[in-house]
């Protein structure tokens, strides 16, 4: 039986007077992903931010490896928001190096160059991010996924602005992450062609 990593029980969140969701319960085991689906405004991003500890719930509990979230959880978390978290004045390589450094991941330059090659940014690695297209900026985050050893990924619409080749690479990267015992929580409008025993669905606002 796979290790139970994340446990969510009785989670509820409001936006002002409006109830986004309530009584949300789920678990995520090692080697599995949970995809959160729902219409715009149903609370998908709020749910992800609440699990990460970025938004306070109105009710409920989130536990990591059987305990309350703390430094250990933050050290094992990779959060990718809806917008690419890049600094315009830094180059693609500098943004990647900074993101990995903040996560405490020491990655040799040759491995960073290999990841930038995989995502099609090696020849643009020295360009300031402000000169990159939206899709190229998203590829910096994809390079981080290739390199970051964090076991738990929380990704908000990770396929947005990626072309077909980059989407395929992201799915291969996610599949490899799950195969080595990682886990993921994703909000996405896309169907993810992963093995049925690795991915489950949670629909909000149904």
Mark where each language-model region is.
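Catalytic Walker B motif of ABC-type/P-loop ATPase nucleotide-binding domains
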Residues: 153-157
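Q-loop/switch helix immediately C-terminal to the Walker
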Residues: 83, 88-104, 111
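Conserved ABC transporter NBD signature motif
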Residues: 57-75
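Hydrophobic anchor residue at the start of the ABC signature
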Residues: 142, 181
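Helix-to-loop junction immediately C-terminal to a conserved catalytic motif
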Residues: 52
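Conserved ABC ATPase "signature" region
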Residues: 97, 109-124
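Conserved ABC ATPase signature
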Residues: 89, 128-135
């Amino acid at each position: 039986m796979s290790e139970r990593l994340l446990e969510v029980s009785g989670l509820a969140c409001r936006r002002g007077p409006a109830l986004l969701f309530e009584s949300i319960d789920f678990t995520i085991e090692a080697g599995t992903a949970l995809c959160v689906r729902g219409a715009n405004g149903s609370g998908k991003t709020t749910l992800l931010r609440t699990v990460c500890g970025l938004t306070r719930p109105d009710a409920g509990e989130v536990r990591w490896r059987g305990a309350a979230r703390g430094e250990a959880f933050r050290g094992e978390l990779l959060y990718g928001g809806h917008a690419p978290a890049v600094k315009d004045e830094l180059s693609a390589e500098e943004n990647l190096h900074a993101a990995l450094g903040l996560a405490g991941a020491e990655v040799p330059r040759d491995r960073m160059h290999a990841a930038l090659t995989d995502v099609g940014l090696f020849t643009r690695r020295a360009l300031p991010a402000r000169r990159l297209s939206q899709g190229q900026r998203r590829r910096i985050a994809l390079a981080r996924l290739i390199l970051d050893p964090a076991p738990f990924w929380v990704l908000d619409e990770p396929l947005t602005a990626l072309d077909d080749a980059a989407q395929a690479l992201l799915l291969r990267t996610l599949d490899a992450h799950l195969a080595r015992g990682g886990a993921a929580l994703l909000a996405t409008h896309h169907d993810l062609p992963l093995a049925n025993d690795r991915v489950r669905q949670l629909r909000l606002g149904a």
